[in-house]
């Protein structure tokens, strides 16, 4: 830096010229000549002598200033920043980011671009000015210092010479220095300027930097081992006819040292100084200063992470908070377990104590204040899929009596009972049903009827008392007090003999225990209907699956109900015991959907005796009649083998009742009737057709039991009151004489007689089976006529009471109105159903506890795997993975919502059909107790554990939005699964559809398929994806305002999270739109689920 020492000598040059010459310095008086002889050949051209030669730095006559490198390809100089021209002698303007596009200075000074300054516009002033030099064109920092500052990459300094005497000597001329260093090359260079004209320049190499930082002072030191300088021709200090420092530059060998001092608060010691042994001696001798003094400003454009002293913010994981959250969630689970244990130990209701008298009065009024209901029906027919199931059934069920509907399997008993109970049938129903001679619409009719299904469907987690009480609370009058309803429940329990088991759980085969027995369950089902004191009670196979003792107890309870409270009880029954049959008041016998008998049970045996189908002694008449309809329904054939049981004994007399004391029919292995053993094999062989093999014992017994006997061949079906009292059985000849007149009776088939098969009467036209004969006999019997007359009389009396004309149109009108009562309101229904649902939930807590335990365990595991997410690209990828995993976990765990209604589908359908409650209250209670414990709490538990462990943004607004998105997503997924579970009845199909829907939604989340890569025609599918809404909302909430660090170009570049999200196809402004989308899908799916339940889960039999 010899130029600094010589700066003060300019005014003294004329005076000290002899001295400099004596000391070896040279002052030129003539211009140097260009030497061209050194070139290997002489270039000759037609260039005129007045034109200068073209610049070519490869020729000795030309050189590169600023010690620029000569480009061997174009003969031009590669200049350092801020200099240009062919020889790097011209300062450039504009700004550093312009690079090769910078323009040479025109005039005495440069017009720099905004944010740039200096003689050659190399000094930055603002951060925005540096952005253009950054790889991503943002994040730039103008690193400026006054008298100091470490060179990070390549810095530039603008200095003012502060030696007082030097400035005084130059007067108005301003000495300045530009100085720059490049750390990678360990080089520096400077230029000396007088009035912004460069005089000379120097280059330093093998440089070292050091910063000494103390509490009050920063000291920056540059030390370069080598130094060389050069002149700009015809400039001050490098004049061709005046002072030239070039000979002095040859003596500068270094080392050179440049120091800058900056103190806290500023002091007179602040500044920069340059020292070099030769220069220091000259300055000391001439100006009395130790070195050249400068006041410098340095600047350097850096990426913000490269600024010295910059430290990326270090995330602090709050370990105590994490431990506290995990402990709190664990304590919550323990609390839930303890609560469940306490509730399961506590009895559902305290032991019953005596209630107030007014409760007894209300219960008594309920039982007594009703109008006896006599049920009449005629011409009941039913068609489904073009097939007739029932045909022309007629009968009466009277109050105070029990009416039994019997028939073989497939006879249509249950179908007929459903029609009487006004159940919703899939087929077409014809006929008339009257109550006390009047017709009623379905809503009025169902107010006073109760129906007990064959299968007992109840919640296994409720006790007997709770099950019956729920029926009472929901179905008894609104103005009836709870105490009176409980009193009514206890009365029914005692009446049915189940009071002693009132606190036992119903139970099930799949549960922890079997619970109560099958007979007890049947009585509980009956109690649920009896508690409402219906005027008409229908029961489908009430003895099904019960042993004989329990079956009798159930029927006896029904008989007591009918007799004691004047109720009408109608039930179907299959093969009852004789002691049960004896309790019947009315009997309806069906065969293949047709009426074989319908009337008083007391007339049944006499009726069948008189038409020739006497129940053998010792047989249960119910079994006999059911078997009779089965055998009679078989096609008739004269070729069937026959057995002669009466040809040998014309004095045989038969009884009119199975209760009379006569010998019983033997078993199939020893079938006989009185004196049948007297028939020898010779007689039997004569009676058997010659081409037929011997009849089996079963066929023989069936022929004995179910073939019409003599004494029944009357001109018309007999009236049970006109039985032949002597019981005389006609002889074979007398029987044979009756075939002709019987065959002439209006299409009736003469009864089949046990006689010689060769003498069987011909089959009458119009009938295929003996069942047709039985049906025809009944239709023309006095019993049927009596029933028909009674129905007609009842209808006419009702019409007369209502003041209507006796006409067919009047009889077809709906005129009746039941004396029903107001049921409880929707709010009360919701409270009762919520209580029932809550009990069912906490008494079967495994699903709920599994959800909670899974949430805690997977939250801790996820927090461990993703612990302390970093703010870089790797951390961004881990965030994507974390959010994707959380959503997949909750999405597929909500498949348990498929079973919310499947396990209670049948229960709901039946309770709805029986008028327990409104569907909306049941749906609301079920959804509420599925959403709160299973869909709301687990994501909150998991969120509060995962969020602090993985180090997501530690701000309450972001945390709240994170939890909100998880909860809404869980609700939306649960709503979709709920809808699927209702629409698809089969659990396997529902699980498959639910899984496919979740996978489809997962595909459009935004991680597996970029938004911008989705075809335009399929883009609308993404609007249906709940995973897309939730995934985008979570990642936008976390990353939008986050700055991620990406290591590129040797720098730690901070990349805005928003730009990365945009590259992945996410919308940075879509957070609340996504939240709204999740909310809409949640609401729409739940509404659609209710609509599906309301319209699809309707009882159709």
From Swiss-Prot:
Residues 1-15 form the signal peptide. This is ABC transporter G family member ARB_01379. Residues 342-845, 902-935, 983-988, 1037-1050, 1099-1101 are cytoplasmic. One of its GO terms (molecular function) is ABC-type transporter activity. It comes from the Eukaryota. Keywords: ATP-binding, Disulfide bond, EGF-like domain, Endoplasmic reticulum, Glycoprotein, Membrane, Nucleotide-binding, Signal, Transmembrane, Transmembrane helix, Transport. The lineage of its organism: Eukaryota, Fungi, Dikarya, Ascomycota, Pezizomycotina. ATP binds at residues 407-414. Pfam families: ABC2_membrane, ABC2_membrane_7, ABC_tran, EGF_2. Residues 16-320, 867-880, 957-961, 1010-1015, 1072-1077 are lumenal. Residues 677-726 are annotated as: Disordered. GO terms for cellular component: endoplasmic reticulum membrane. PANTHER family: ABC TRANSPORTER G FAMILY MEMBER 28, ATP-DEPENDENT PERMEASE-RELATED. Glycans are attached at residues 28, 218. The chain crosses the membrane at residues 321-341, 846-866, 881-901, 936-956, 962-982, 989-1009, 1016-1036, 1051-1071, 1078-1098. It comes from Arthroderma benhamiae (strain ATCC MYA-4681 / CBS 112371) (Trichophyton mentagrophytes). Residues 375-617 form the ABC transporter domain. Residues 84-122 form the EGF-like domain. CDD domains: ABCG_EPDR, EGF_Lam. It is a multi-pass membrane protein. Disulfide bonds join 93-110, 112-121. Belongs to the ABC transporter superfamily. ABCG family. Eye pigment precursor importer (TC 3.A.1.204) subfamily. Gene3D superfamilies: Laminin (2.10.25.10), P-loop containing nucleotide triphosphate hydrolases (3.40.50.300). It is found in: Endoplasmic reticulum membrane.
């Amino acid at each position: 830096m010899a130029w600094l020492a010589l700066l003060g000598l300019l005014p003294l040059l004329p005076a000290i010229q002899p001295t400099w010459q004596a000391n070896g310095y040279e002052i030129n008086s003539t211009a140097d000549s260009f030497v061209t002889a050194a070139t290997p050949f002489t270039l000759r051209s037609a260039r005129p002598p007045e034109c200068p030669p073209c610049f070519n730095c490869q020729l000795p006559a030309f050189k590169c200033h600023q010690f620029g490198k000569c480009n061997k390809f174009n003969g031009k100089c590669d200049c350092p920043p801020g200099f240009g021209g062919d020889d790097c002698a011209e300062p450039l303007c504009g700004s550093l980011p312009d690079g090769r596009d910078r323009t040479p200075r025109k005039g005495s000074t440069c017009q720099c671009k905004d944010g740039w300054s200096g003689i050659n516009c190399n000094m930055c002033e603002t951060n925005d000015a540096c952005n253009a030099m950054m790889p991503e064109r943002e994040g730039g920092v103008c690193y400026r210092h006054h008298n100091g500052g470490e060179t990070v990459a390549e810095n530039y300094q603008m200095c003012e010479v502060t030696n007082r005497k030097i400035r005084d000597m130059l007067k108005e001329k301003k000495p300045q220095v530009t100085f720059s260093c490049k750390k990678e090359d360990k080089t520096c260079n400077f230029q000396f300027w007088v009035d912004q004209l460069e005089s000379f320049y120097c280059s330093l190499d093998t440089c070292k930097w050091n910063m000494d930082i103390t509490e009050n002072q920063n000291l920056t030191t540059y030390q370069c081992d080598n130094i060389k300088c050069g002149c700009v021709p015809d400039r001050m200090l490098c004049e061709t006819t005046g002072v030239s420092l070039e000979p002095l530059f040859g003596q500068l060998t270094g080392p050179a040292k440049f120091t800058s001092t900056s103190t806290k608060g500023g002091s007179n010691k602040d500044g920069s100084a340059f020292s070099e042994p030769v220069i220091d001696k000259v300055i000391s001798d001439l100006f009395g200063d130790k070195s050249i003094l400068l006041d410098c400003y340095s600047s350097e454009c850096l990426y913000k992470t490269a600024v010295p002293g910059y430290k990326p913010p270090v995330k602090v994981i709050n370990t105590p908070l994490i431990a506290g959250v995990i402990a709190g969630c664990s304590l919550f689970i323990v609390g839930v377990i303890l609560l469940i244990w306490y509730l399961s130990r506590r009895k559902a209701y305290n032991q019953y104590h005596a209630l107030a008298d007014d409760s007894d009065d209300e219960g008594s009024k309920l039982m007594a204040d009703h109008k006896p209901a006599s049920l009449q029906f005629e011409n009941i027919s039913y068609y489904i899929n073009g097939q007739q199931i029932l045909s022309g059934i007629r009968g009466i069920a009277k109050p105070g009596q029990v009416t039994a509907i019997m028939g073989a399997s497939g006879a249509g008993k249950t179908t007929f009972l459903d029609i009487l109970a006004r159940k919703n049938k899939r087929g077409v129903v014809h006929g008339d049903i009257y109550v006390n001679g009047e017709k009623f619409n379905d809503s009025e009719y169902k107010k006073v009827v109760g129906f007990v299904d064959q299968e007992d469907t109840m919640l296994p987690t409720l006790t007997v008392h709770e099950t019956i009480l729920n029926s009472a609370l929901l179905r008894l009058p609104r103005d009836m007090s709870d105490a009176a309803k409980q009193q009514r429940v206890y009365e029914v329990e005692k009446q049915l003999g189940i009071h002693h088991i009132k606190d036992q759980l119903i139970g099930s085969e799949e549960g922890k225990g079997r619970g109560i027995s099958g007979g007890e369950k049947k009585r509980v089902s009956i109690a649920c209907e009896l508690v409402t004191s219906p005027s008409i009670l229908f029961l489908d196979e009430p003895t099904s699956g019960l042993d004989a003792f329990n079956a009798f107890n159930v029927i006896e309870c029904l008989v007591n109900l009918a007799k004691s409270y004047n109720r009408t009880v109608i039930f179907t029954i299959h093969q009852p015991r004789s002691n049960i049959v004896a309790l019947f008041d009315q009997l309806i016998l069906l065969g293949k959907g047709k009426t074989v008998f319908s009337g008083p049970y007391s007339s049944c045996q006499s009726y069948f005796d008189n038409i020739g189908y006497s129940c053998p002694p010792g047989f249960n008449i119910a079994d006999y009649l059911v078997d009779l309809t089965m055998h009679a329904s078989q096609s008739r054939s004269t070729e069937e083998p026959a057995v002669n049981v009466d040809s040998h004994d014309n004095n045989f007399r038969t009884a009119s009742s199975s209760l009379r004391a006569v010998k019983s029919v033997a078993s199939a292995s020893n079938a006989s009737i009185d004196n049948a053993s007297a028939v020898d094999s010779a007689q039997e062989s004569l009676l058997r057709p010659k081409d037929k093999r011997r009849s089996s014992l079963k066929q023989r017994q069936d022929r004995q039991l179910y073939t019409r006997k003599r004494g029944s061949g009357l001109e018309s079906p007999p009236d049970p009151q006109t039985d032949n009292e002597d019981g005389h059985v006609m002889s074979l000849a007398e029987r044979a004489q009756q075939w002709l007149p019987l065959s002439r009776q209006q299409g009736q088939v003469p009864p089949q007689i046990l006689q010689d098969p060769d003498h069987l009467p011909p089959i009458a036209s119009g009938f295929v089976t003996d069942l047709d004969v039985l049906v025809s006999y009944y239709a023309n019997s006095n019993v049927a006529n009596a029933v028909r007359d009674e129905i007609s009389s009842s209808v006419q009396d009702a019409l007369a009471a209502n003041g209507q004309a006796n006409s067919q149109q009047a009889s077809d009108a709906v005129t009746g109105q039941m004396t029903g009562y107001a049921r409880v309101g929707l709010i009360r229904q919701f409270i009762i159903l919520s209580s029932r649902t809550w009990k069912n939930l906490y008494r079967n807590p495994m699903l709920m506890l599994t959800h909670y335990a899974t949430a805690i365990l997977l939250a801790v595991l996820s927090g461990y795997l993703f612990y302390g997410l970093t703010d870089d690209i790797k951390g961004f990828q881990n965030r994507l993975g974390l959010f994707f995993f959380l959503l997949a976990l909750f999405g597929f765990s909500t498949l348990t919502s498929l079973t919310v209604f499947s396990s209670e589908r049948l229960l709901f359908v039946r309770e709805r059909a029986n008028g327990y409650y409104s569907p909306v209250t049941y749906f609301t209670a079920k959804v509420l107790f599925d959403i709160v414990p299973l869909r709301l709490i687990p994501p909150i538990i998991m969120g509060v554990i995962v969020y602090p462990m993985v180090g997501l943004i530690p701000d309450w607004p972001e945390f709240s939005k994170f939890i909100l998105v998880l909860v809404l997503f869980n609700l939306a997924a649960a709503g979709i699964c709920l809808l699927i579970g209702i629409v698809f009845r089969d659990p396997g199909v529902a699980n498959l559809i639910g899984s496919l829907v979740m996978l489809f939604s997962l595909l459009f989340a935004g991680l597996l398929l970029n938004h911008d890569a989705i075809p335009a025609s399929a883009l609308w599918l993404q609007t249906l994806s709940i995973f897309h809404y939730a995934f985008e909302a979570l990642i936008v909430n976390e990353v939008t305002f986050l700055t991620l660090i990406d290591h590129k170009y040797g720098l730690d570049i901070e990349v805005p999270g928003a730009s990365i999200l945009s590259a992945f196809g996410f919308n940075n402004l879509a957070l609340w739109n996504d939240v709204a989308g999740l909310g809409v899908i949640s609401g729409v799916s739940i509404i659609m689920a209710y609509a599906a339940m309301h319209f699809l889960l309707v009882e159709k039999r």
